[in-house]
Amino acid sequence: MSVSMLKSSPLHSASVASGLLKCFLGAHPLLPATYEKCGLTTSCRRSTTIHSPAKIWQPPSCRYFSKSRPILSPLPETSEQSSPSYLSTANKPPGTDEQGLKSDRGDINSDSKSTSKTSRSKKSNVPRSSKSTTQKREKPEKPRELEPWQIQKQALKKKFPEGWNPRKRLHPDTLDTIRHLHQQDPNIYSTPALAQEFKVSPEAIRRILKSKWQPTPEVAAERRERWEKRRKRIWNQLSEIGVRPHRPSFADVSDTKVLEKKRRTVGSK
């Protein structure tokens, strides 16, 4: 038995050395089945655990080169370098940073002041509930006293809803003619008919009919002279211009029959 052990000793030492080398290189040793029961496997495991931190350089395989990226590929630009803020800060001189900080502080202060002003203005705009305002609201507003001219204006509007025609100066003989026609036949020569005929307002006809005042013979003579002078003056002025004045149809009328004839002739035309 001793002879056989001696013969196998050099072979055993060579296999152990090769196994240790493979363990150091990181490859698992392919030990024969006879050494599985031996303690060499345990020693190899211990040696791998002890020497695992010290990695030995191994040449990469061809598959690594085929799958790996190209070595000279351009590196992606960082977001900081590409951002405009980074470029602006990089190009700025050193003194501008302090100025920017001061301006930022000034903006913050101005914003705070503006917010405080707006809050004050809102508070000032809020209506204050005071006793004076409540008393004013509770008291009913008294109607204003109208002036005399306002009262008269309202009365005229009520009396003449269609409007007020200004007074027209009529000849004294015309006033007598209006009264005479109305006395002859009030139904035919009514107030609207007389107003349409003499081109005055119905209110003026009513006043003429109601008035009972008659001038004295002396006043009537003076009035006729005055009106004759006025007529001549107007006639002369218009004749100088070259326009013949229109003489009204009722100037010399004193009878109702004449007016009736003229009305019939106008209606037939």
From Swiss-Prot:
Reply yes or no: does the keyword Mitochondrion apply. yes
Keyword Mitochondrion in the entry? The reply is yes
* Recorded family membership: Belongs to the RRG9 family.
Give the matching InterPro entries: NGRN/Rrg9
| Superkingdom, natural source | Eukaryota
What keywords does the record list, in alphabetical order?
Answer: Mitochondrion, Transit peptide
The name under which this protein is listed is Required for respiratory growth protein 9, mitochondrial
Q: Where is this region: Disordered?
A: 73-171
One matching Pfam family is Neugrin
Transit peptide, from-to: 1-72
Regions of biased composition (Polar residues) lie at: 76-91
Query: Which residues lie in Basic and acidic residues bias regions?
Result: 99-110, 135-147
Q: What GO CC terms are in its UniProt record? A: mitochondrion; nucleus
Question: Disulfide connectivity?
Answer: none
The record describes the protein's role as:
Required for respiratory activity and maintenance and expression of the mitochondrial genome.
The record's subcellular locations are: Mitochondrion
